[in-house]
């Protein structure tokens, strides 16, 4: 079991700022560096993964599109969505990539169960679904044995921009969110529950709250 998983709550932050910072963090970390999770929300943005195809961007309109280095296709981030960037030494943890993906999916399924929402993963389409509608997405990159990028859980947000794309490359894929499934919820409580479930499902002994921003990685 790993020792401590540190969490930084960064609030609303520009996508590209977070992306460049997580790449630099991963490139500069040493073998003894502690693992971190950055909890954020983003202003509206579409991100196109390495497998992304232009035809899945239907009508982006005035929402920016950023080509990124994670796996997967196009998705949307916006306020009211809880994003967790997972900077983990996967090699040290002893996880394979498929194992890591399964653990993240199980984390989200357990979190949703805390709210009485029955969710499931799909073997052929990474993410978490409620009655066939996608409630959480994930996309990772592994570099030098360490992960970055992570997961995005729709908590209480405007889902309309998802209709401007084929989410994750699937035409007509329905999207849902926790507030539609469980009623009124506190975003901060969801974040706290996600922290606890990540610690449990990634086999850490405890969690720690990290202070300070990420400007030195930007």
UniProtKB/Swiss-Prot annotation:
Substrate binds at residues 70-77, 137-139, 150-152. The record marks 134 as: Lowers pKa of active site Cys. Residues 31-206 form the BPL/LPL catalytic domain. The keyword Cytoplasm applies. InterPro entries: aa-tRNA-synth_II/BPL/LPL, BPL_LPL_catalytic, Octanoyltransferase, Octanoyltransferase_CS. GO terms for cellular component: cytoplasm. Gene3D superfamilies: Bira Bifunctional Protein, Domain 2. Coiled coil: none annotated. Its EC number is 2.3.1.181. It is found in: Cytoplasm. The active site is at 168 (acyl-thioester intermediate). SUPFAM superfamilies: Class II aaRS and biotin synthetases. GO terms for biological process: protein modification process. Keywords: Acyltransferase, Cytoplasm, Transferase. It catalyses: octanoyl-[ACP] + L-lysyl-[protein] = N(6)-octanoyl-L-lysyl-[protein] + holo-[ACP] + H(+). It is an enzyme of class 2 (transferase). GO terms for molecular function: lipoyl(octanoyl) transferase activity. PROSITE patterns: BPL_LPL_CATALYTIC, LIPB. Pathway: Protein modification; protein lipoylation via endogenous pathway; protein N(6)-(lipoyl)lysine from octanoyl-[acyl-carrier-protein]: step 1/2. In the reaction, the free carboxyl group of octanoic acid is attached via an amide linkage to the epsilon-amino group of a specific lysine residue of lipoyl domains of lipoate-dependent enzymes. HAMAP family: LipB. Catalyzes the transfer of endogenously produced octanoic acid from octanoyl-acyl-carrier-protein onto the lipoyl domains of lipoate-dependent enzymes. Lipoyl-ACP can also act as a substrate although octanoyl-ACP is likely to be the physiological substrate. Belongs to the LipB family. PANTHER family: LIPOYLTRANSFERASE 2, MITOCHONDRIAL-RELATED, OCTANOYLTRANSFERASE. This is Octanoyltransferase. The lineage of its organism: Bacteria, Pseudomonadati, Pseudomonadota, Gammaproteobacteria, Pseudomonadales.
């Amino acid at each position: 079991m790993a020792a401590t998983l540190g969490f930084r709550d960064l609030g609303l932050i520009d996508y590209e700022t977070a992306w460049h910072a997580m790449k630099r963090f991963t490139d500069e970390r040493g073998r003894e560096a502690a693992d971190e999770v950055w909890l954020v929300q983003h202003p509206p943005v579409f991100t196109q993964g390495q497998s992304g195809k232009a035809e899945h961007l239907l009508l982006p309109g005035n929402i920016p599109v950023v080509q990124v280095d994670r796996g997967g296709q196009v998705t949307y981030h916006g306020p009211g969505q809880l994003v967790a960037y997972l900077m983990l030494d996967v090699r040290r943890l002893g996880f394979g990539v498929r194992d890591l993906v399964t653990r993240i999916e199980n984390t989200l399924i357990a979190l949703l169960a805390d709210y009485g929402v029955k969710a499931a993963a799909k073997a052929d389409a990474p993410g978490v679904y409620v009655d066939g509608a996608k409630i959480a997405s994930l996309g990772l990159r592994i570099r030098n044995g360490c992960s970055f990028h992570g997961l995005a859980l729709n908590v209480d947000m405007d889902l309309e921009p998802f209709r401007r794309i084929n989410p994750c490359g699937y035409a007509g894929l329905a999207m849902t969110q926790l507030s539609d499934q469980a009623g009124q919820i506190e975003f901060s409580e969801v974040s706290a529950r996600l922290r606890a479930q990540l610690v449990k499902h990634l086999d850490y002994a405890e969690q720690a709250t990290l202070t300070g921003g990420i400007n030195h990685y930007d």
